[in-house]
């Protein structure tokens, strides 16, 4: 388990076919352990992004948050 004050563990972004995946796991000084992931795809005529995050353990533990968005250019 991650102890209070432990370093965050951002994983290197991974790219595959224009998709970029960025996972992250960290713990803050209040004892909250948060995991999150961001996904992006930037193309010639579009941008897409989505993310999911959750405080897994700690005083701010709650339901996950998420977002999805994008743009299309003609």
Swiss-Prot record:
Extract one GO cellular component term from the record.
extracellular region
Domain of life assignment: Eukaryota
Q: Name one Pfam family in it.
A: Coleoptericin
User: Keyword Secreted: yes or no?
Assistant: yes
Q: Which parts of the sequence are annotated with region: Disordered? A: 1-74
Tell me where it resides. Secreted
Q: Which UniProt keywords apply?
A: Antibiotic, Antimicrobial, Immunity, Innate immunity, Secreted
Q: What does this protein do?
A: Responsible for the anti Gram-negative activity of immune hemolymph of Z.atratus.
Protein name, UniProt field: Coleoptericin
């Amino acid at each position: 388990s991650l102890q209070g004050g432990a370093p965050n563990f951002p994983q290197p972004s991974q790219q595959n076919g224009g998709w970029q995946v960025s996972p992250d796991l960290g713990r803050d000084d209040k004892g909250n352990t948060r995991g999150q992931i961001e996904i992006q795809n930037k193309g010639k005529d579009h941008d897409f992004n989505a993310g999911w995050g959750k405080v897994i353990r700690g005083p701010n533990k709650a339901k996950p948050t998420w977002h999805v968005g994008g743009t299309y250019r003609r």
